A protein has these predicted regions:
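Short alpha-helical DNA-recognition segment
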Residues: 16-34
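Short basic helix-loop element that most often maps to the first helix and adjoining turn
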Residues: 6-21, 76-77
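DNA major-groove recognition helix of helix-turn-helix/homeodomain DNA-binding modules
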Residues: 27, 46-63
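Helix-turn-helix/homeodomain-like alpha-helical modules used for DNA recognition
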Residues: 60-79
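A detector for short, charged/polar N-terminal pre-domain segments
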Residues: 1-3
Length: 79
């Protein structure tokens, strides 16, 4: 499932993460995040995987493009 810039911004918002926080969690530069979210360039497949993994580890589940479009939701945390 390709990560969309809008999903990236939405996932960061749900996690209350800055671009810098995501960059640190994924091991990429903040400018990579900024340029991707502003539609300046696409991500390399390996970078996309790192971002998705960082979101999943933090509890943000990326939803594929379905009837209502792609999305993001937070996973339930165990009590």
């Amino acid at each position: 499932m390709p990560l969309l810039p809008e999903q990236c911004r939405a996932a960061r918002g749900l996690l209350n993460w800055t671009q810098q926080r995501l960059a640190a969690a994924a091991g990429v530069s903040r400018s990579t995040i900024k340029d991707f979210e502003c539609h300046r360039h696409a991500l390399h497949e390996s970078t996309e995987h790192l971002l998705i993994e960082a979101f999943e580890q933090a509890g943000a589940h990326l939803l594929p493009d379905g009837r209502d479009g792609p999305g993001v939701r937070l996973k339930r945390l165990p009590r």
